[in-house]
Amino acid sequence: MTNKIIQMLEAEQMNKEIPTFAPGDTVVVQVKVKEGDRQRLQAFEGVVIAKRNRGLNSAFTVRKISSGVGVERTFQTYSPLVDSLSVKRRGDVRKAKLYYLRDLSGKAARIKEKLS
């Protein structure tokens, strides 16, 4: 059981508006990237294959195929490096963790779109 003071401090830091998303959804994550003295936004678009809800320590993993190679990236939900998160498409899946997508390729790795 966490301390009440820790809960209060974490609640203060969780002030970011995060849209509702689930595994199977296609999301676009805008990430702040620092190159030398410049800072820019980089978009990372892919399918959410895992989500971890732990308050301030929440995280999610996004997978995409980049020039034939699978790329996975785990983001801390409330990280200051994550600028924005938008849901492009809702996926209809039955599992909470979609790690089986790592072994699939091509059309087999597609996810059905959720209707409604």
From Swiss-Prot:
Gene Ontology BP annotations: translation
Entry GO terms, CC: cytosolic large ribosomal subunit
Protein's UniProt keywords contain Ribosomal protein: yes
Sorted UniProt keywords: Ribonucleoprotein, Ribosomal protein
Keyword Ribosomal protein set for record: yes
Family indicated by similarity: Belongs to the bacterial ribosomal protein bL19 family.
Xref: NCBIfam families: rplS_bact
Name of the protein in question: Large ribosomal subunit protein bL19
Gene behind the chain: rplS
